[in-house]
Structures are given as structure tokens and as C-alpha cells.
Regions:
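RNase H-like nuclease fold core
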Residues: 1-43, 54-59, 118, 122, ...
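RNase H catalytic domain
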Residues: 3-16, 50-115, 119
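Catalytic-loop motifs flanking and including active-site residues across diverse enzymes
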Residues: 44-48
Length: 127
């Protein structure tokens, strides 16, 4: 089983943004991050999940996110009026795996969510 913690950040909305991912696997843990000069927090939240899913071979995994936008769009069928380009990529990746979705409260002391948050903000500051 693989656990993926994701977070997105934006300084201003829109503005410079970043995403961070913490991937926990049985024998290997690693971090990913990136950013964009002009984006939104929601785009960075979705991008974090996409990058996490793209970088694991495991078919059985749990994605943890503090974004109700991401979690509720995936699990409750919220309308995808914006960010269609990213939702299409995410839906394709999800269709290839068995993904369990878990919301985690942001800034609540969860070690891995906090690390993903630091990665995301670090990237946003670099832009």
C-alpha cells in the first residue's frame, strides 16, 4: 500500500504557486515539488495529486489532501466547471489505480501534510 500526501499553495490567488507531495511506500519514501509563476491554489492542489499519482507504480493507494475542493470533486461528484484540463488528466490516472481518498485537516499537526505544505509554499516563494 502507498500513501500520498498532497498540498498546493498560492501567494495571492491567482499568483505564484507551488505544489508538494510526500509519497510513503513500504521500502521507499520520497518528496516531489514544483511551481508555476501565475496560477491558483486549486490548480496547485490538483497538480499535486496528479504528480503524486504519476510517480508511483502501486495500484493500491490512499491520497490524503487538505483540499475539500479536490476530495469533494472526486468523491461527491462536484461539478468540474474550472480546471478541466487538469481534471481530465487526474481522472485518467485515477482510472488506472485503486485510489482511496482521505481528507486531512490542514495545519493540524499531521507530519506528512505539514511536509507537503512546506514543499508547496517553498515552491510558491521561488516563483
Amino acid at each position: 500500500m502507498t500513501d500520498i500526501y498532497t498540498d498546493g499553495a498560492c501567494i495571492g490567488n491567482p499568483g505564484p504557486g507551488g505544489w508538494g507531495v510526500v509519497i510513503l511506500q513500504e521500502n521507499d519514501n520520497f518528496f516531489l515539488s514544483g511551481g508555476e509563476k501565475n496560477t491558483t491554489n486549486n490548480r496547485m492542489e490538483i497538480t499535486a495529486v496528479i504528480e503524486g499519482l504519476k510517480n508511483v507504480d502501486s495500484k493500491d493507494l490512499t491520497v490524503y489532501s487538505d483540499s475539500t475542493y479536490v476530495i469533494n470533486t472526486i468523491t461527491k461528484g462536484w461539478k468540474k466547471n474550472k480546471n478541466q484540463d487538469l481534471w481530465e488528466i487526474l481522472e485518467k490516472l485515477v482510472s488506472e489505480k485503486n485510489v482511496k481518498w482521505e481528507w486531512v485537516k490542514g495545519h493540524s499537526g499531521n507530519e506528512f501534510n505539514e511536509k507537503a505544505d512546506k514543499l508547496a509554499y517553498g515552491e510558491a516563494k521561488k516563483q
